[in-house]
Amino acid sequence: MQGTVNSERLKFDAEVGKVLKLVIHSLYTNKDIFLRELISNASDACDKLRYQSLSNQDLMDAGSELKIVISVDKDKNRLYISDNGIGMNREDLINNLGTIAHSGTQKFLDAINSGASSQQGVVELIGKFGVGFYSAFMVASEVIVESCKAGESVGYQWKSSGDGEFVISQLESDQVSRGTRITLALKPEECEFVDKFRIEHIVTTYSYHINYPVYFLNDKGEEERLNSEAAIWTKAKDEISAEEHQNFFRTVAHVGGEPWMILHNKNEGVIEYTNLLYIPSIKPFDLFHPDRKCSVKLYVNKVFITEDNVQIIPQYLRFLKGIIDSSDLPLNISRETLQNNKIIEKIKRSLVKRVLSELKKKAESNIEDYTKFWDNFGSVLKEGLCESMNTEFREELISVCRFYSTHSNDSLISLEDYIERMKPEQNNIYYLTGNDLDSIKKSPQLEGFVSRGIEVLLLVDPVDDFWTNVVTDYQKVPLRSVIRADEDLEKFSDVEKDDESKESQNEDAQSKEKVDKFISYAAQVLTNLVSNVRVSKKLTDSPVCLAVADGSMDIRMERFLREQKQLNYKSTKILEINSKHPIVSKMIDQYAENGENAVLCNMLHLLLGQACILEGEELQNVSDFAERMNNVLSQIN
């Protein structure tokens, strides 16, 4: 540290103590950021010199390297940050480091104390004060700034303990170098910040991609570089090699494999930002972990801000990896209060629109490749459909969703594909939810639809039970579960029964009375176990199935809510009976000939149990079910 002359003690505004207290104890929640702020200021100083040297080449020696150097003195518990940027003279030191004493300070405090100002308004007010520099007082009992402005030969020192005043002095030496050197006399409890590895971690985390090299001066007097050569996202698309993408992807994604998709865009509209985002080709193991956080890092002018405190990427796009860098966000204290930032919201909407647009292009151009993405992240993407407030991009989101169906075998289809294949008399998009594709294809619920050539979506992700209760239609075509769509089938001809003779139809009409009586008997036997018993129009091969009335909760959703202790009752379902099934047909004939008996009663209970098992419902009384089964089996001759 150099000697000084002509010292002058100046006072901050009377309220500066309150402001410093707010900055140190309230606005910054992470002490590490003091170094980020000082490095950012040093980078700005280098930027200013580079810009001004374009019009005045004498300010900067040809070929000289603009850089930032960090060094420590462990014995004195001191940390030094130096740059050879534009530097400051006496007037600059007073104005730049004394900005906090401007008349707006009291207004700022009034806004904080009254709570009348919006969070964003307060953030913008903070941006006027150069508060980032003062974050150094979180860790330092004294801050000393020595600086010499480019083109001048006299250097000055600014010194303060953050107690409401500062001292300005002239440096004695006439051999001062251009630039600025900040000395932090660290508090005893902050000795961790003279540790080289701690400093390297902070630089790597927050300042890895700034424009200028950041060096650490080691014990041997050697400068070790701590940051990257350049921010890859600042390059043009065609200047980034596949190897560079692969290396950066591994750095930000922490997953194996190659990126399935790369989204590199520079937005220069109302909001300026650059995004370099990757969609992995491998699903992360913790994709559905409840504590999983966003993996997209937010930068401001290549300075890392956060990846935790801001929802710049919605949860349903959490498979995205990479960075977003904006020059429209303030590079100051606002990084701690970005949650309700209007600029962030605009960037978020723009990104969502871009990502969904690129996914749609891929789905339409290469369904085989898109299927790989869908198998990994389709269930996550559909989470966006569950958000009742997320209506802005709902149509776009559904358009990139793909589904299995009774028509497509094992290939995926879009809802546009489904609508194009709808029958002329069909008014609904039909779907069925289940646990897996193999079992759902065998569901009795599908029989009547398949026999009539009506396509049904097969939804097998847990999230499907949720979004189908939020999204009611697509392109004005209602979505309808086959579990509650029995009555719809009357208007469709059964392709397997079109050759049925009028004689057979007359016989059916004559047997209707027997069927009705049996249905009434079944409803009486199963009183309190089901809400209704009716003849099914959807069953062709199975004897029975469960159904729910319109307006009732889906069976799987109700079961999920019960399991999560969010529902404390179990509703009674409708039992649908296939009167044409051989077993049921014999039961109808027996009842018509002999009336009620114990065997028929047991068989009705067993059929209800079968229907429950097929829908994944628990039997009310397993022992009773087994006893009835044994009684019926004992009747076999």
From Swiss-Prot:
It comes from the Bacteria. GO terms for molecular function: ATP binding; ATP hydrolysis activity; ATP-dependent protein folding chaperone; unfolded protein binding. Gene3D superfamilies: 3.30.230.80, 3.40.50.11260, Heat shock protein 90, C-terminal domain (1.20.120.790), Histidine kinase-like ATPase, C-terminal domain (3.30.565.10). Its main location: cytoplasm. Residues 336-559 are annotated as: B. The keyword Membrane does not apply. GO terms for cellular component: cytoplasm. Residues 1-335 are annotated as: A. Keywords: ATP-binding, Chaperone, Cytoplasm, Nucleotide-binding, Stress response. It is found in: Cytoplasm. SUPFAM superfamilies: ATPase domain of HSP90 chaperone/DNA topoisomerase II/histidine kinase, HSP90 C-terminal domain, Ribosomal protein S5 domain 2-like. Homodimer. Belongs to the heat shock protein 90 family. This is Chaperone protein HtpG.
